[in-house]
């Protein structure tokens, strides 16, 4: 099992499970969309300010992120420490620009960027930046047979 193979698995899809820690120490799991920026060893995720996962990360920035192949035979877990961007407050602030980059990397072009910018502010969106410190899992192809 190599880290490169696990990074490849993180890069292949755009959906996974973000694991944060509740106040009582139990895990809280959220299905989310992501993009893995391999050169930065960074998983980025768009979230809203009022969600449990966001509150959990403000209190304890440790997190894990799980992805798997469609057949679930291969998986990767990325563990690390999260940094949260500021909440989007203006359609042209740095947070909205980062959200646009993330959207493009996950989905592609948006049909109306002005509408998107306004929605990011209205929804009080921000970016979760999970700096990958450790990976483990079973790379694609290693569990066939």
Task: Name what the model sees in each region.
Residues 1-17:
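Short, basic/aromatic recognition patches
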Residues 71:
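AMP-binding (ANL) adenylation modules
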Residues 12-13, 60, 123-124:
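Structured helix-beta-strand junction loops
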Residues 74-145:
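Charged, gly/pro-rich active-site loop segments
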Residues 14-49, 63-67, 75-78:
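Short beta-strand segments
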